[in-house]
């Protein structure tokens, strides 16, 4: 209290402070504001203002003042420093009113400025910037009480204290520092004014982080933005310092000079050269002081302007809004900054930044209405005409109409303009201006613009087009208009879009796309705006349109999330206040209940597409209230499919963005329920990981992987924790540290391959100022290798400004259900007979029940920077798609269609804007604009034949993509309608033609295809040329805001590129491609390079981190007509013991049947029981023809594959051959025994050999390669010492050789570690290159690691290579030698010790478990790896069978079994301990048995003859023997069985995932449910489970009958999931009712 009393006392003595009544003060004004790319160049653009300020002191609390003789001069030149003296300035008169104004004081501190009502707003703010220099508080009037304050007095003229002080830049905390001026300081205008006092320095430093009043405009800022508006630090930062010299004492003084300098920076976090700045200063210097001799006349029209803070203009009126005088607290009422400053709040309390006394403040702009454009302050088009909207200058609807016509014309002629290598036609800049113009329009003006689009006067160029093109031009015109209006984002734009939908102008997919942009572009979505949008989405005109009704719901929910869940983040609340009042309960009372009711109705109707849409919409709200809607479905009290519940869990991601603790709590409880569906648990883990979970939770999840048996969930946890532990960004280090601690608790044996996984990728492109984090989350399937769900999230930032994230995802209930629907299509079952299949009879005997069908549900979601699309799918969708496809195919077969063409046009737009007043009174503005223009021209036609197997399809068109990233910093001078800019534009444009014609002619004997690329007859629909343009253009500019229609392709003195050096060009050509590169970084010497050197220089220029330096790249590529013919054939090959060679080609012409037959015969040589394929293709480019022929053969019995290849280039007109190449090669593996002990004695070996010949008739050059990939004793010795082999030998004592330990042991002892390869060649070039390579390696390696070898054994032109892997040392020894050079080194010598390459990991990965089923001596192993004891007895047991499923559309009907999956494998045990196998493949039966010491096979009762060199071949399978084993291999059914009489190894493809039953389990990747029996429930005892698959109806001896009776009496567990209570009463938003009796109370 003593401190406050002291301030009150000293304030009473300070009557005049800086102003002595009756005096007149004359100050000189100097002001400058400049913008620059300060880290790239010192090329400035800006303005200098000078003038005079006269002040007459009327009374202690009133000053009369006038600003006069003001002049300004533009600056656009290079300076050493921004505050240097600038020569050669040309000043023009700055037309200010010259009217006097009053300054109101309280205790010497300025409280208000009264200015004539007729003075324009821009002049008021300039006056305030000048008067702000006189705000000096030496008596603590605005002091912020603090124990750190040092109060100055006359005896101690030193002071340090903080005050809450207003200036034109805002009312913010200011740190005062007062010190005496040194005696030798000579820059004081009138040093004698100090009289008996002193000269003082007063320094004021403004803290923009703590402000009570900030004037600003912002839009497009994401909720992830890591800086606060107008702060002193961060990506966009500002600082301000005032230096004031006063004379006298702290109570009575004269202000001699006052200088305020301010700096605003945009600092890139990625590359300094992308940084930019705005510097400004305002200086007042005392020129003279005297008694008042000519009193100023006072205006009778003075009104308060509030205080010194910048005031907003009314863009659409020349009348200023009346302001109330500032009611500031004096020192008696001073508040502590620690307790009161609202700007010192928590970041989480974002919605409370406005005054505690009320949501709205008097100085804010009026709330926008729906019919009128918002009164957006500070923006060029709203203040650019003397402080008012540019609408005052001309008819902007006519300008906008001309822009639309120009853009449409540019798009229509874009293929022609593609040839222009001069400064390219500017497509994007007119779009940017058009959108910003529409933002200034009201509803009537947008309607007027719409009407003008039909006026021919605006389409003088377009009207000259032929009728066909005119129709396309008109469509393009309207497409641009629709997209531009929605991109404007204002209330009038919303009303206009609504009207267009209501009257049918916008409909179907185009309307859906347009409406999805509304939440992305909305600028001022007030309660009225949101409610009008709600009326639109519930209107029948929307709800009845298929695509629109989905898009509208999601767009609305997204908008509501931005306006209510993130109230102060996205929109200009510093200009208008909160868009939606805190008292607005429409979200809770109307919007969410409406969606919830619609979801209930959709579930009652069983309409999956509607259900999915409303789940997505509810999730998009991101509000806790949604939990109460999802609660009964997630907890199982109301019915919903697993897929629908999965969508609800995924939707928690939106909730986690604003309520991370709440979302984490619910998700963690879902994850912890091990009886829940694995898909939901995986999705819940992903949600938890997004919320920065506490360490104890991460540790719990990691530790639980040691108990949890769900492989998908464990894989998700492991991959996510690993990804988080590797995060490097500073903001994520806390999370990364926790993940690294938790990682130590993970189960070390988690298998992630083929299971659900999470990935995180980081990419930084400093040269483009872009950074990107990509998160890919996958939920695997149990019935296919294709993931069931995949979520791709892309987070991009530009130098530190985060762009709205993009998301792409798909979700599907079951790919198997989709396949089942495909198999039920008429063309898949049209040849079926009514005869009951053998497999069906077997299934009936077992009594296998069909599973309850999984209804097919799915969706595709794409959410980009610009728009979003959601496509829900169900059975009906697939049927509709298939029926549409059938209609198209049918129409192709019945008739032909002439070629027609259509255009698809998209204009996408995103911008981020930050604007606030500078201390010089001029509006600062930073914009990041990312527009994209996409044009797709596509046309097609078709022909068909009813009598022949002939079809032809033609398509042609082009794609044009133009994207710009425009970063601009600068300020606006309303009085001269100029926007001073320092900017960097990154432009990308691609125009490429698309043209092809396909004809297909297929018969049983021959299959031929003809493909023509860029067919010349359709060249007019494309161009035949492709162009690419990329540029980074830094520049400074002095843009005339009113000159809207200037020629963008021409440079003038108002726009100057920033060149650090004189730019030079590089030209180079590649065939029909021409390229030009131009840059500051290309010097005169580099510009002379050609060919490969020029290409290297260009690649270096654009691929390395080059920052914002000027560079440009243009490419022109010509694509002529290319005709491609192709054919293929297949044959079973006769055995021929001779060696295959490159033959003398019988016919070298394209499409030769003779050559194909020759190749099939040749490629089958030296192979037994081989199958062969041949593929032939010719490519006719007009000037030459290239011929390719490839033949391939394989033999299962030989474990050998062989290929023969031929290529030539020949003349189009005659058979002259220009070039020719032939190659042949094979790879052969050695068969290894199933028995590990026998395999130990064998040496695994892969033998390979290849020969290549070049030149006409192959007589020029030859290359021969042969080698082996084998095992050394090192691997054998290592294996024998391993625990795996020891465990295997224990299993083998019981007669088991195929249990998991022995499978791994077999792999371990068969690992190959030695590669030996030799190359013989006649090519001197290749041989010389090899020698140079060896010498280069020698130069890389220290002499200590190089060993010289004896090379006497190497012959001329032979290259030998040997690689010996050293897994124990995690290394490899490599030897290279020729007759001229040799080197031996280790792999680590080259790649270093820090490389990710690991020999240990490579060998370890080879031991991963495979999905095989085993019947061993005493145990069995399921496909999913479950091991259990098994005794079959002499009774057939089903190892594996496919089984029918119920039709999801008709539960009484059973789906047919796909023809390529009709397979059963059965086994029984004989009295001698051997086993027999019975296989049913389609309608054939295969029997395998052991007879004495021999293995026998029969097919349909007939003995199958085979040997080690010949297989028994059937249409769909073959039988062969090797290493005392019979193998049945069926590529048709994708089944392989290996049998040695006592042990059975069964392998099937992923096509059988979750589609089988039997002793081998259900093959769903989860071992814990493998004991599923025919009744579709799960037993716990192995013997009972096995007995349920015994064919007890037939002759059956052994334990099976008795065990089957026990199984019928045992408890069989249901396979259904068991949801739990995961949402508490409190989380659901209601008072607690559950668990009231819990605990002792």
Swiss-Prot record:
Residues 342-351 have a biased composition (Basic and acidic residues). It is found in: Secreted. InterPro entries: Lipid_transp_b-sht_shell (IPR015819), Lipovitellin_superhlx_dom (IPR011030), Vitellinogen_b-sht_N (IPR015816), Vitellinogen_open_b-sht (IPR015255), Vitellogenin/Apolipophorin (IPR050733), Vitellogenin_N (IPR001747), VWF_type-D (IPR001846). The keyword Magnesium does not apply. One of its GO terms (cellular component) is extracellular region. Glycans are attached at residues 344, 549, 566, 831, 875, 898, 1001, 1053, 1268, 1393, 1396, 1505, 1523. Residues 1-18 form the signal peptide. Precursor of the egg-yolk proteins that are sources of nutrients during embryonic development. This is Vitellogenin-1.
